[in-house]
Protein backbone atom coordinates (compact mmCIF):
# COMPACT_ATOMS: atom_id res chain seq x y z
CA UNK A 1 0.00 0.00 0.00
CA UNK A 2 1.13 3.52 -0.77
CA UNK A 3 1.69 6.24 1.79
CA UNK A 4 -1.21 8.68 2.11
CA UNK A 5 -0.63 12.07 0.49
CA UNK A 6 -2.83 14.01 2.92
CA UNK A 7 -2.01 14.39 6.60
CA UNK A 8 -3.94 16.02 9.43
CA UNK A 9 -2.41 19.12 10.98
CA UNK A 10 -3.33 21.48 13.79
CA UNK A 11 -3.48 25.23 13.16
CA UNK A 12 -2.73 26.95 16.49
CA UNK A 13 -3.62 30.58 17.18
CA UNK A 14 -0.72 33.02 17.52
CA UNK A 15 -2.79 35.08 19.98
CA UNK A 16 -1.83 32.53 22.71
CA UNK A 17 -5.44 31.63 23.48
CA UNK A 18 -5.00 27.89 22.96
CA UNK A 19 -7.68 27.85 20.26
CA UNK A 20 -6.92 25.69 17.22
CA UNK A 21 -8.39 24.34 14.00
CA UNK A 22 -7.73 20.83 12.66
CA UNK A 23 -7.35 20.57 8.91
CA UNK A 24 -5.51 18.48 6.36
CA UNK A 25 -2.90 19.25 3.75
CA UNK A 26 -1.16 17.47 0.92
CA UNK A 27 2.35 16.84 2.24
CA UNK A 28 3.76 16.23 -1.25
CA UNK A 29 2.77 19.58 -2.75
CA UNK A 30 2.93 21.74 0.40
CA UNK A 31 6.26 20.90 1.99
CA UNK A 32 6.60 24.09 4.05
CA UNK A 33 4.65 24.97 7.20
CA UNK A 34 1.13 26.25 6.62
CA UNK A 35 -0.13 29.52 8.08
CA UNK A 36 -3.57 31.03 7.59
CA UNK A 37 -5.43 34.07 8.83
CA UNK A 38 -8.62 32.79 10.47
CA UNK A 39 -11.13 33.82 13.13
CA UNK A 40 -10.26 33.26 16.80
CA UNK A 41 -13.51 33.38 18.84
CA UNK A 42 -11.66 33.83 22.15
CA UNK A 43 -10.27 37.26 21.18
CA UNK A 44 -13.08 37.85 18.64
CA UNK A 45 -10.65 38.80 15.87
CA UNK A 46 -8.99 37.36 12.80
CA UNK A 47 -5.44 36.32 13.70
CA UNK A 48 -2.64 34.27 12.16
CA UNK A 49 -2.78 30.52 12.76
CA UNK A 50 0.43 28.48 12.38
CA UNK A 51 0.86 24.77 11.76
CA UNK A 52 1.83 22.49 14.66
CA UNK A 53 1.87 18.73 15.14
CA UNK A 54 -1.15 16.85 16.43
CA UNK A 55 -0.18 14.99 19.60
Curated annotation (Swiss-Prot):
The family this protein is said to belong to: Belongs to the bacterial ribosomal protein bL33 family.
Signal peptide, first to last residue: none
Gene3D superfamilies listed in its UniProt record: Ribosomal protein L33
One GO BP: translation
This protein's name: Large ribosomal subunit protein bL33
Gene name of the record: rpmG
Gene Ontology terms, MF aspect: structural constituent of ribosome
Top-level taxon of the source organism: Bacteria
Pfam family, one: Ribosomal_L33
Classification via InterPro entries: Ribosomal_bL33 (IPR001705), Ribosomal_bL33_CS (IPR018264), Ribosomal_bL33_sf (IPR038584), Ribosomal_zn-bd (IPR011332)
